[in-house]
Amino acid sequence: VKNHDIEAAWNYHNATKHSHESIRANRHYLDWENQPKPFKIYSQLEPIPLPEHLSSSGTPALFAVSAADADAVGPTTLTSQTLAEILFLSAGITRRRPYPGGEILFRAAACTGALYHIDLYAVCGNLGGLDAGVYQFSPQDFSLRRLRAGDYRAVLVRASGAEPSMADAPCMIAGASTFWRNSWKYQARAYRHCYWDNGTMLA
């Protein structure tokens, strides 16, 4: 059943859009003593290191994202190696730059305020080198952490309304926002950023 009542969406949009007045009237400040952690940490789960030797497909990025079908950009066999490449190019740390008092981490996909609130999860069947399960991608040490053992892909297929393109996918990658990591700076606008930043990673 489609929901044609979009009044709530318009109300949110109008309440959170920027204007000359709203920017000057907002007294919000960054509470550095309460800054969110930049990563979700599962301290009691063992990391499963991902392959660190990442190859290049040789395909220009604009061609890859505009291709009409998967065959245009090469084979689609998925292994832990190709999964590592996808995760790195979506949310990986591409460079580290030290500065007095810390380190700046550059990521593969841009994010509002460089807060990187979208965490990625791989839901897969048995892949070459990786058992079926639900895994959290940990960019800080380039590893996976298994949250659930077993094949949960059917759960996502049902949640999608039985989307045909998902039915035979060997792996699905889901993005979820750690909302506080973004709203700490952007307050109510963070809900917009969940979609902007997730879309940037998916592209």
Where are these regions (language model features)?
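N-terminal accessory segments that position/regulate proteins before the catalytic core
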Residues: 1-203
